[in-house]
Swiss-Prot record:
Gene3D superfamilies: q2cbj1_9rhob like domain, Rabenosyn, Rab binding domain
Keyword entries, A-Z: Dioxygenase, Iron, Metal-binding, Oxidoreductase, Vitamin C
Pfam families: 2OG-FeII_Oxy_3 (PF13640), PKHD_C (PF18331)
Cofactor requirement: Fe(2+); L-ascorbate
Protein name listed in UniProt: PKHD-type hydroxylase ABSDF3031
Transferase listed as a keyword: no
Domain of life: Bacteria
GO molecular function: 2-oxoglutarate-dependent dioxygenase activity; iron ion binding; L-ascorbic acid binding
PANTHER family: PKHD-TYPE HYDROXYLASE YBIX
Length: 227
């Protein structure tokens, strides 16, 4: 399932990110690509060793751990520290699938990539082209969100960033190992969580059905989660 998570960063935070990123030193994006995806990857990245990458990454990590909608949709167990890229005119990243296992930066720890995430750092009207195109069983989905918003989607999906025809597209990208690896189970849990939240709004926390559904939700987490 594809999730749109709005306002992960404020407009003020985005503006500060952009100021720092526009003054940064960029390297070729193929440094983090697998052998197959490197052949279709034409973009630029901040180096993983750049102190700016660490600084911005810490801000993004804090924001997503504190975002209730992200937590409900992803059920994160581990998060790869975010990286940052830019696409200038004629740059793109053709259809590819993300690596199933990745190292956490600066450690020997590996994580399974269950969910892929893009945090948009350019407004849609700042560039032409550059859509994130995600393929799933229902077809192709073109995604271009406001700056500060995140799209979250299964890492099993083929996806691309279409060619930039004008302007520059800045973004952050990262991966999540979920407590629940199966996308269909995560979707069921998210739908149940949404129903519980709506019942709490309309009937209050002491409503008996809220208690029953919350019990079911947590028991399903116990049944399906991996730690």
């Amino acid at each position: 399932m594809i999730h749109h998570i709005p306002n992960v960063l404020s407009k003020e935070q985005v503006a500060e990110f952009r100021k720092l990123m526009e003054e940064a030193n960029w390297v070729g994006g193929k440094v983090t690509a697998g052998t197959l995806s490197a052949s279709v990857k034409r973009n630029q990245q901040l180096s993983e060793q750049d102190p700016l990458t660490h600084h911005l990454s810490d801000i993004v990590i804090k924001a997503i751990w504190q975002n209730p909608l992200f937590q409900a949709a992803a059920l994160p167990h581990k998060i790869i520290p975010p990286l940052f890229n830019r696409y200038d005119e004629h740059e793109s990243f053709g259809f590819h699938v993300d690596n199933s296992i990745r190292l956490i930066r600066g450690t020997a720890e590996q994580i399974r990539t269950d969910l892929s995430c893009t945090l948009f750092l350019s407004e849609p009207d700042e560039y032409e082209g550059g859509d994130l195109v995600i393929e799933d069983t229902y077809g192709y989905h073109e995604v271009k969100l406001p700056a500060g918003d995140v799209v979250l989607y299964p890492s099993t999906s083929l996806h691309e960033v279409s060619s930039i025809t004008a302007g520059t597209r800045f973004a952050s990208f990262f991966w999540v190992q979920s407590l629940v690896r199966d996308d269909s189970k995560r979707h069921l849990l998210f739908s149940l969580d949404e129903s519980i939240r709506e019942l709490r709004k309309s009937h209050g926390d002491s409503y008996s059905e809220v208690m029953k559904l919350t019990n079911i939700y947590h028991n399903l987490i116990r049944m399906w989660s991996e730690l």
